[in-house]
From Swiss-Prot:
Keywords: Gibberellin signaling pathway, Growth regulation, Nucleus, Transcription, Transcription regulation. Gene3D superfamilies: Helix-loop-helix DNA-binding domain (4.10.280.10). One of its GO terms (biological process) is regulation of timing of transition from vegetative to reproductive phase. It holds the Pfam family bHLH_ILI. Belongs to the bHLH protein family. Plants over-expressing PRE4 show long hypocotyls, pale green and slightly narrow leaves, elongated petioles and early flowering. They are not sensitive to the gibberellin inhibitor paclobutrazol during seed germination. This is Transcription factor PRE4. PROSITE patterns: BHLH (PS50888). The lineage of its organism: Eukaryota, Viridiplantae, Streptophyta, Embryophyta, Tracheophyta. One of its GO terms (molecular function) is DNA-binding transcription factor activity. Residues 5-60 form the bHLH domain. Expressed in roots, leaves, stems and flowers.
Length: 92
């Protein structure tokens, strides 16, 4: 008698419905550049959205690491007054 929409999953003390999961997957789909650019290709499976989300997060993390390394190298190559100024700007 329970429909797909009314089913829920219990995670700890909270309940989440299939409809809420579908809404979250749709929100992720809209955020992913790879999938957002291909909207006319039709419906994308939740599995694909989650795989693309994981891949996108890994890529963003790698970019952050690379930029952090570049910034560290830049700060090492500048004099201490300039480095202090850059650090103070970054902390704001």
């Amino acid at each position: 008698m329970s429909s797909r929409k009314s089913r829920s999953r219990q995670t700890g003390a909270s309940m989440i419905t299939d409809e809420q999961i579908n809404d979250l997957v749709l929100q992720l789909h809209r955020l992913l550049p790879e999938l957002a650019n291909n909207r006319r290709s039709g419906k994308v499976s939740a599995s694909r959205v989650l795989q693309e989300t994981c891949s996108y997060i890994r890529n963003l993390s790698k970019e952050v690491d690379d930029l952090s390394e570049r910034l560290s190298q830049l700060l090492e190559s500048t004099d201490s007054a300039q480095a202090a100024l850059i650090r103070s700007l970054l902390m704001q």
